[in-house]
């Protein structure tokens, strides 16, 4: 009988490292010795973080930590959508150019997505944007309202914004209390045995750290996976052009301006800027391509966008786009930035961490390190990353913006996968892009199924229709279904009524978050309102 894994060393703290330590100490029921080594000298990347809705279910619920416990400690706020600004046309102060990417799938009527009925109406002169017609949430988002009633009853599916450093610190305390050994030191050498497996690590202060399994959370350095084990990193800069960012925390007058319950993505001349609102401030960063603008010009554009002074503290980031050929090599598993990186346009960074941890536990080895387990794990990570890469890329090559060289290059010069080409053609023909049921309650029963079918028809519809790319024609079948069309009209009317109910019953996001911070809100005791349009989903 092969020996079980008894000792695990995690290299790197930050969000990835402490999420890994917390998840593994819980998953292995404290039956393995877990040591995390982090250096006080190596800075952690992160200026505000946006997430997706499955974070609570897959990660925090697994740890047994309710939303109301962790949110106040990490300056947590709600995210009910992503708002895309100026992605269709160059900025014009006289014009409001935005669309929302909402959570939840598109409703259907007699087996046909409501978007097809909306398109038919649009062909007849209907002007309301798709997401405003097919979802009840946008009006509440425009009003900066919370996704919950004052008593904590949830009315809209949501994800979260938070300070990633505070999350790492929160999880550090949680993990150490449960037996994780924290070492503040720096790895200076990685020793391999004659099989090419990592045997131990040498540290700056003279320690020798031995383990059966090593988790590389060292960030883009890839200290173990790339530097020591020489696993190649597959560069995908021909799929996505942005390679740099300038970021900062920006003060916000919440009482005057409110706190937006969504992430904003504001298109710029050579990239886009994120805005992640929290109480008292928002995290923001300009993601740009160094091939189309200089760092100095990008910094100037970023400061001008928010009216900031030249002495504003800034975080300059250079990133690699792509993934390791294999995320798991021998007895080393890379998690987080050491495994892969995709620009945060759809808030996938934290998801990549806990999805990889979920898959690691599902494929957890013993000391024989059966290659069938690592091969299966690696295939899952390739699927996860490439699928998300295609979805993010779809935001760029389907836009109609052509006012700068950057946007022209995105429309004409990107390398496209066969999978995304096929999705575009299916969308233009009016066909479904994914095979999932339109019933969210069955779709989201297990994370395994969500992982395999991450981006739904509704996600693609929001982006494609939002950017102005529509199917070639409304579904021909609807010409033969007058009764279905009548039913769809009733559904549109019901959505309008629900939108009005949300608009008139929800507190402002600022008031709700302030009550949560002060301990007054009945926040999220697992309650869901009867009108909730979608489960914890994308």
Swiss-Prot record:
Stated consequence of mutating residue 79 to A: Loss of halogenase activity
Annotated residues for binding of FAD: 13, 15-16, 39, 42, 45, 49-50, 187, 337, 350
Protein's pathway: Antibiotic biosynthesis
Name of protein: Tryptophan 7-halogenase PrnA
Sites annotated Important for activity: 346
Tree of life domain: Bacteria
Effect on the protein upon substituting residue 274 to A: No change in halogenase activity
MF terms in GO: monooxygenase activity; nucleotide binding
GO biological process, one term: antibiotic biosynthetic process
Phenotypic consequence of residue 272 to A: No change in halogenase activity
Residues the record marks as active site: 79
Organism name: Pseudomonas fluorescens
Residues involved in 7-chloro-L-tryptophan binding: 79, 346, 443-444, 450, 454
Entry EC no(s): 1.14.19.9
Gene ablation phenotype (knockout): Cells lacking this gene lose the ability to produce pyrrolnitrin.
């Amino acid at each position: 009988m092969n020996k079980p894994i008894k000792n695990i060393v995690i290299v790197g703290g930050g969000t990835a490292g402490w999420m890994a330590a917390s998840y593994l100490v819980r998953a292995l029921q404290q039956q393995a010795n877990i040591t995390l080594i982090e250096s006080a000298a190596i800075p952690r990347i992160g200026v505000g973080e946006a997430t997706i809705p499955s974070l609570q279910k897959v990660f925090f619920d697994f740890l047994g930590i309710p939303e109301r416990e962790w949110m106040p400690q990490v300056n947590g706020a709600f995210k009910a959508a992503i708002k895309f600004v100026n992605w269709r046309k160059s900025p014009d102060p006289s014009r409001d150019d935005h669309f929302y990417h909402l959570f939840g799938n598109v409703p259907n009527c007699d087996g046909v997505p409501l978007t097809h009925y909306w398109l038919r109406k649009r062909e007849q002169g209907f002007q309301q944007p798709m997401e405003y017609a097919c979802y009840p949430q946008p009006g509440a988002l425009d009003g900066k309202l919370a996704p919950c009633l004052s008593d904590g009853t949830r009315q809209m599916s949501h994800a979260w914004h938070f300070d990633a450093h505070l999350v790492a610190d929160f999880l550090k305390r949680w993990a150490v209390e449960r037996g994780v050994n924290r070492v503040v030191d720096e790895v200076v050498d990685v020793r391999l045995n004659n099989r090419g497996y990592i045997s131990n690590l040498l540290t700056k202060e003279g320690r020798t750290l031995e383990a059966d399994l090593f988790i590389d959370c060292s960030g883009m350095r890839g200290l173990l996976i790339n530097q020591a084990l020489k696993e190649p990193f597959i560069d995908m800069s021909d799929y996505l052009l942005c390679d740099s960012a300038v970021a900062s925390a920006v003060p916000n007058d919440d009482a005057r301006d409110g706190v937006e319950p969504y992430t904003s993505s504001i298109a710029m001349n050579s990239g886009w800027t994120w805005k992640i609102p929290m109480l008292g401030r928002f995290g923001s960063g300009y993601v740009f391509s160094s091939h189309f603008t200089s760092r100095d010009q990008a910094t100037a554009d970023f400061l001008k966008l928010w009216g900031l002074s030249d002495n504003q503290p800034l975080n300059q980031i250079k990133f690699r786009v792509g993934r390791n050929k294999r995320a798991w090599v021998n007895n080393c598993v890379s998690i987080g930035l050491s495994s892969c990186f995709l620009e945060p346009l759809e808030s996938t960074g934290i998801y990549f961490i806990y999805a990889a941890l979920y898959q690691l536990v599902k494929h957890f080895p013993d000391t024989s390190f059966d290659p069938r387990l690592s091969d299966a794990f690696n295939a899952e990570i390739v699927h996860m990353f490439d699928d998300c890469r295609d979805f993010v890329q779809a935001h760029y090559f389907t836009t109609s913006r052509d006012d700068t060289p950057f946007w022209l290059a995105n429309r004409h010069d990107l390398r496209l996968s066969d999978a995304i080409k096929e999705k575009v053609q299916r969308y233009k023909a009016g066909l479904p892009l994914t095979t999932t049921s339109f019933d969210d309650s069955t779709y989201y029963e297990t994370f395994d199924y969500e992982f395999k079918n991450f981006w739904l028809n509704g996600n693609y519809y929001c982006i494609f229709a939002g950017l102005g790319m529509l199917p070639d024609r409304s579904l021909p079948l609807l010409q033969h279904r007058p009764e279905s069309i009548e039913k769809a009209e009733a559904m549109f009317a019901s959505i309008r009524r629900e939108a009005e109910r949300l608009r008139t019953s929800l507190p402002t996001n600022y008031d709700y978050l302030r009550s949560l911070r002060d301990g007054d809100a009945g926040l999220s005791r697992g309650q869901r309102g009867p009108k909730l349009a979608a489960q914890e989903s994308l």
